[in-house]
A protein has these predicted regions:
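Transmembrane signal-anchor hairpin modules in multi-pass inner-membrane enzymes, especially those
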Residues: 1-100, 106-113, 123-147, 200-213, ...
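Flexible juxtamembrane loops connecting transmembrane helices in multi-pass membrane enzymes
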Residues: 175-176, 238-239, 259, 274-317, ...
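Register position in tetratricopeptide repeats
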Residues: 536, 574, 607, 641, ...
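TM-adjacent membrane-interface loops and short helices in multi-pass inner/ER membrane proteins
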Residues: 182, 303-306, 310-353, 360-374
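Canonical tetratricopeptide repeat
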Residues: 567, 600, 634, 668, ...
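Alpha-helical transmembrane segments of multi-pass inner-membrane proteins
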Residues: 2-7, 14-38, 55-67, 95-103, ...
Length: 828
């Protein structure tokens, strides 16, 4: 009896198997889709730690399970086909270059941890590709699962917004994070999953197509409410690309009516979404609530070039690193360490960006330009595979259907990677693995068994005569020399069995090593969270030994790039164990451009009374971080002790030129100048401060006080005599000295004011009024002087004018004026 032939795999990949799906494979696909999302924080400082650990454990489980499968055991192509595909090969070469760049690493522990993350996502893509090649229906399963989760994400967002509005509050979009670590990851998770809904809409039928349309609509609505500009642009590009795809697709079928229907539906859905969003902003959001995330779509678009200074500065510093290290970079995971060489001189504090906010640039910075090109080629090859299949003459839907999802998926991921750092976010990294796994699985043909008939459809990556195509010329030439090299390598024969065994053992060893590394990192992250929460209290409360003994060997810098030794030092400082702190700090070389260890070393030496050593390390900090004002204060404190005022004043003057809009430099500098006897310099410094900060009350106040002191200084002894006589109530003597002083310095308003009081107490009201007039002419009026003029006027019989002055004095807060106003001005 003749067996019914099973349908051969097409150019898009695996065979279509008619039997039911294998539960274990289905479970693994669903697990890869959701494992990073559902893994809890476990009270760590960075939820990425436990999520990467969970993904690594899933990789080990998957690999072990796949090795035991009979249908895979005797087929080397099941495990090695990934590496003969140009996408998989580009990814593998990226891993190899990442390993090579270890030789450039400043901090090898960070490189090990970072490589473990890269390898974990790579393995996830590898496992997904093997499973998807068994049966394309697993892709549908993954698409449905992730579309359902996309709907859950969207409705979680809508629920939080609705709850806030019902309570009469603003939506507080920034605080909404669902099961993710923050708002930005939620926004990315929504956007990067949209291609799954697009795929269901484009290629499924009936209920699944309707579900795809519904999911696409709510995802678009959620993207609007998240108010993320990068994803606004991404949504526009994705929708335009989809409409172009639909247009060409139905044009070739002569189904213009269908094209119009689909296009109208998509555009109408977007228009309705924008309308609902705008109406919510206008009618439901509280009128008195306003933030970055509660402005209209087009208003938000207008700010797309604003607020990007931090990203732009970060990218600029990254390009400097790339220029210095174009071949192998600064080492994987070392961007946050190496970039401080350029970030420190412009940062006034220790709040650093520990990510580039652009994975393409960060990869080039850390592992070289070629690595970044290989990363880009993953996206390019996936897109070209789809375009080649789609534009092929007489192309059937079956030839490009399965390539649509990875192409559009990587397009969405690319937007996130260009503006953020999804490579370090396992929730998004797992989606990348799904897309890359699908791209590899469905762009490679199975090699026929010996003696069997070859497939009648050539694999898209093999070198065959190029048929007439509608692909534009430039697209057909994109796979250049690099593509040809990868294609050549992809034709290397599969490994012999004797090589497969050691490779399998090696792969398992790396998987186990990654898990061990993530466990150690997990333990460190738990302590990092405790330390961070303790630091936010008024005083450190946790026991020092918990951190001194508890932190593992690595990582030796925190998730925020702070050397771990600094965290330990804070507790030793609290316990006044400065010698122990010095021993730890001096032995640390985890981050050579981070000056926190040197800052604490200087402080430890100071606390031990070793001021010269303290000054040496303070100057080391200053050399790298000239805008860190606390360090300048410490330097000036020691210089002042050594009576080296000119040196200290020069430091402060330099600081005020570099940070002209910071009041602390002007105020501290003025006090320092005053202490050193340089009043003229103090006033000059405050004049400069008033120029940049004209409304700063403290600068104006200090300038006024120092101006008085500068006028008094040449005749200080005489002025002090006048004041002392006034205090002793010897008003005649005080008038004598004040008059003598005024003859020498006629421009000191305070001298006229005090002499006016003396004349009043001597009952010489007219002379008192004359001096008060001078005070008012100089603009020195205050509550006290209004009250003084009032009592003079009362004594001179002008109660109407006196009451006006008493009332003004009360308004200005003069307490002595209150009884005068009550007694002489209120009607009985």
């Amino acid at each position: 009896m003749k067996k019914k032939p099973i349908r051969q795999g097409t150019a898009t990949g695996p065979k279509k198997i008619s039997k039911g799906l294998d539960f274990a494979y289905a479970f693994l696909i669903a697990a890869y889709a959701l494992i990073a999302v559902v893994t809890p924080n476990f009270y760590t400082f960075d939820s990425n730690g436990p999520k990467f650990l969970a993904l690594a454990l899933l990789n080990l489980l998957s690999f072990a399970y796949l090795l035991t499968r009979k249908e895979l055991k005797d087929r080397d192509e099941s495990f090695f086909l990934f590496f003969r595909n140009r996408i998989g090969l580009a990814y593998l070469l990226l891993l190899v270059l990442t390993l090579l760049s270890f030789i450039k690493a400043i901090n090898i522990y960070e490189s090990i941890l970072h490589f473990s993350k890269i390898f974990t996502v790579f393995t996830a893509a590898y496992m997904v590709s093997i499973i998807l090649r068994r049966d394309e229906r697993y892709l549908r399963l993954g698409a449905v699962v992730l579309s359902v989760w996309l709907v859950i994400d969207c409705f979680t967002l809508f629920y939080h917004i609705t709850s806030s509005l019902i309570e009469g509050k603003g939506p507080a979009i920034f605080q909404i994070k669902s099961v993710y670590s923050n708002k930005n990851i939620l926004a990315a998770a929504i956007f990067v999953k949209i291609p799954f809904a697009l795929w269901l809409l484009a290629f499924e039928k009936g209920k699944l197509r309707i579900f795809g349309m519904f999911t696409l609509f709510v995802a678009f609505m959620a993207t609007l409410f998240m108010s993320t500009r990068a994803f606004y642009v991404g949504s526009l590009v994705m929708m335009v690309s989809y409409i172009l795809f639909v247009g060409i697709r139905y044009y070739r079928r002569n189904s213009i009516k269908r094209f119009i229907t689909v296009t109208f539906t998509v555009i109408a859905a977007m228009a309705i979404g924008i309308g609902l969003y705008s109406a919510t902003l206008k009618y439901l959001y509280p009128k008195n609530y306003q933030d970055l995330y509660t402005v209209g779509l087009f208003e938000r678009f207008k700010t797309i070039a604003q607020g990007e200074s931090l990203r732009a500065a970060s990218w600029d510093r990254s390009f400097k690193l790339i220029t210095e290290n174009p071949v192998l970079g600064v080492g994987p995971g070392n961007w946050k360490i190496a970039v401080l060489k350029y970030e420190n001189p412009v940062k006034p504090d220790y709040v650093y960006q520990y990510k580039t906010h652009n994975d393409f640039i960060e990869i080039a910075s850390e592992t070289g330009i070629l690595s970044s090109i290989l990363f880009i080629m993953i996206f390019v090859f996936a897109g070209l595979n789809f375009l080649k299949a789609f534009f092929k003459k007489d192309a059937t839907e079956e030839s490009y259907r399965l390539l649509f999802l990875p192409a559009f998926g990587l397009l969405a991921y690319g937007f996130d990677a260009f503006f953020n750092f999804p490579a370090d976010r396992p929730e998004i990294g797992s989606l990348f693995a799904m897309y890359v796994g699908a791209a590899v699985a469905f762009s490679t043909i199975r090699q026929p068994a010996a003696g069997s008939a070859p497939s009648n459809v050539p694999p898209p990556e093999s070198f065959v005569p190029r048929p007439a195509s509608r692909v534009p010329n430039f697209l057909s030439r994109v796979p250049n020399f690099l593509s040809r090299v990868l294609n050549f390598l992809s034709r290397v024969p599969r490994p012999a069995s004797r090589i497969s065994v050691p490779l399998t053992i090696l792969y398992l060893a790396i998987l186990l090593a990654c898990i061990a590394i993530f466990i150690v990192n997990f333990n460190s992250l738990k302590l990092q969270r405790l330390a961070k929460e303790d630091l936010m209290r008024e005083k450190l409360a946790e026991p020092a030994d918990m951190f001194i003994q508890g932190y593992p060997l690595f990582p030796n810098v925190s998730m925020e790039a702070e050397p771990i030794v600094v965290s330990k030092t804070r507790y030793l400082f609290r316990d006044k164990k400065y010698e122990e702190a010095l021993a730890l700090l001096l032995a640390d070389h985890s981050s050579p451009y981070d000056t926190r260890p040197e800052f604490f070393i200087a402080q430890a030496y100071y606390n031990l009374g070793n001021y010269d050593s303290s000054l040496v390390y303070n100057y080391k900090v200053y050399a790298w971080k000239p805008l860190f004002f606390n360090n300048i204060l410490n330097i000036c404190r020691i210089l002042e002790m050594k009576n080296r005022y000119p040196e200290a004043i020069s430091l402060v003057e330099t600081y005020t030129k570099q940070s002209p809009f910071k009041e602390d430099g002007y105020l501290f500098g003025a006090a320092l100048c005053e202490n050193g006897g340089y009043l003229d310099k103090a006033i000059t410094l405050l004049d400069s401060g008033q120029k940049y900060l004209p409304d700063n009350a403290e600068i104006l106040k200090q300038k006024s006080l120092l101006t008085v002191k500068a006028k008094i200084k040449p005749n200080e002894a005489l002025y002090n005599k006048a004041q002392q006589a006034y205090v002793n109530k010897d008003y005649k003597e005080s008038v004598k000295y004040f008059t003598e002083f005024i003859n020498k310095e006629p421009n000191l308003t305070a001298a006229y004011e005090l002499r006016a009081y003396c004349y009043f107490f001597l009952k010489d009201y007219k002379r008192s009024m004359a001096d008060i007039g001078r005070v008012f002419a100089d603009g020195g009026q205050n509550g006290g002087i209004y009250n003084l003029r009032g009592v003079n006027l009362h004594m001179l019989g002008d109660d109407v004018s006196a009451c006006r002055d008493f009332e003004e004095a009360v308004k200005l807060g003069d307490k002595d004026a209150i009884p005068n106003f009550e007694q002489f001005c209120k009607k009985q």
